Amino acid sequence: MDITAILHMHAELSLTAVFILMFLLDLFLPATQRHWLRPMACILLTIQLLANLWPEEVTLFGGMYHSTPMASVLKSILTIGTILVFLQADTWLKREDTRHKQGEFYILTLSTLLGMYFMVSAGHFLLFFLGLELATVPMACLVAFDKYKGHSAEAGAKFILSALFSSGIFLYGISMIYGTAGTLYFEDIPAGLTGTPLQVLALVFFFSGLAFKLSLVPFHLWTADTYQGAPTTVSAYLSVISKGAAAFALMIILMKVFGPMTEQWSEILCIIIVATITIANLFAIRQNNLKRFMAFSSISQAGYIMLAVLAGTPQDMASLVYYIVVYIAANLAVFGVISTIEQHTHGKIEREDYNGLYKTNPKLTMVMTLALFSLAGIPPFAGFFSKFFVFMAAFHSGYYLIVFIALVNTIISLYYYLLIVKAMFITPNEDPIGNFRTATPMRISLLVCVAGIFVLGIISGVYQLLSDTAIL
């Protein structure tokens, strides 16, 4: 193979260049100039994003690497979400105990993003696993970023144990696939799949490994502890970017690799979806800590995301992508408000702390309310349309009962989302959170998220554009 063919991996190469530049800046910038790290990270990542807006279909290394226009769209979505997270991290990283670790945060985050790029463009299970681990190992460091705080260290330990267990299960499933199909190339595996018991077991192990990354029930047990203990900005990144990449990868592999076994994995997925949405909703109602609340909300949203996967056609990839784009905007808006209030109040993240928030911080309250309405699926916000497209995709595929159960759970979710809205607007507070000015980078991030919640709901052409690009 001509070595110049590697240059066609321009998304990965340009992101690697950003990684190296950030590493050098972190290494050589004096302490008095380290405040330039965040703007440089955002600028470099934006340039990288713009440089990859003209995608092409590329197959390299005999099919081990395969990038399509849709894969480029997915990478762009993950990159935009990462830029928003960088903006939200600004105030947190300026604290005295984290100021000296700014460079580490950006380098670790870029490492996880590079791993997700490889997951999305993998055409071979070996490359996919390398991307998965590249996305997971730095994430463990991010979860334990505040390592001298007990909750963060505990969250990091639990994340590492979950990651090790899920990786082991995933590898075991891959080994079974290789033993029965004789190859690990995505294009060649379907020809060797006949639905034997060993292949079904391999499918179960593969799915279980990725289910940990998506926090699907029953693989969710330490998710709430991880979200609560991790820094809020890291929890935001974990809930949307990491989960979005895993969902993209899962659908691509189920369509490309396990297409001949659709009957088997669709049955598994039906059970997982019902359990995930229902159990997560029941636990979310009981939560007072907003980070634990958002953890169970994230688990529930993962169940809705799986509805698009269940639909099982490449065309339904559009509903999955649209849902995740909207989910990124709404979830980052909520976590942005939580992070802002947490930084200015030295850790207030309980629901009762938000009582009467509208009287002292009306703008943050409105951002939080709009985002929660979108997550709940209330029209005319984008969350309503994202749920509608996902439900219609599953309905047209004949999963009527699953759609009905999901609709019932959507109604249940209104209760716990509106509990927070009620607290902010109606419930009195003798010691309310004081008024404060939100940092400019956070305001930019929240403005983009709110604009996304409105614009993605109003402009239906976004969904049509994704439908036209949805080629796995």
Swiss-Prot record:
Subcellular location: Cell inner membrane
Reaction(s) catalysed (UniProt annotation): a quinone + NADH + 5 H(+)(in) = a quinol + NAD(+) + 4 H(+)(out)
Pfam families (UniProt xref): Proton_antipo_M (PF00361)
One Gene Ontology biological process: ATP synthesis coupled electron transport
An annotated GO cellular component: plasma membrane
GO MF entry, a single one: quinone binding
Assembly and interaction partners: NDH-1 is composed of 14 different subunits. Subunits NuoA, H, J, K, L, M, N constitute the membrane sector of the complex.
UniProt record similarity statement: Belongs to the complex I subunit 2 family.
Protein's name according to its UniProt entry: NADH-quinone oxidoreductase subunit N
Species per Swiss-Prot/TrEMBL record: Phocaeicola vulgatus (strain ATCC 8482 / DSM 1447 / JCM 5826 / CCUG 4940 / NBRC 14291 / NCTC 11154) (Bacteroides vulgatus)
Name of the gene this protein is made from: nuoN
